[in-house]
Amino acid sequence: MKTTTSKSSIQNLEEVLKRFLTNKNTFSLCNGEKENLKANLYELLSKLYDNYQLACIDINQIWVYETCYYTFTFESLVTVDRPRENIIADGCIRFMQNFTDGDGIFISFTKLDKNPWVYQLNFRIS
C-alpha cells in the first residue's frame, strides 16, 4: 500500500497553486483577485486532502469561447480500490461544486496510471 510522498503536502500544494497562478491561469486577474483565488483553492484542496487523502499535484485551465475548462490531477496517499475510488470521486465532485458555486459541469474522473493512485478530475464552467 502506498503511503506518503517525499515533500510535505502543504509545500507541494503551495507550489502547485503558485505554478497554476503564474503559468497556467488564463484569467486576467489583479494581485488581490489572484490571492483570493489562491486562498479559495488552498482551502478547498486542503479539505480534499484532509478528508480523502488526495493531494493535488497539478492544475490546468483553458478558455474556449465562452467556456472555461479545468483539469485537476490528484495523487492518493493510499492505494485506491474500487469502493474507495467511488468515495474519492464523490469528494472530487463536491470539491468541483464548492469551487464553482454549483455552476461546474462534470466531464470525467479518470485513473491516469496503471498504479491506482493518480486521478484526474475534468469539468467546465460556461
Where are these regions (language model features)?
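Short, intrinsically disordered low-complexity segments
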Residues: 6, 18, 33, 81-83, ...
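Short, low-order "capping/linker" segments at domain edges
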Residues: 118-125
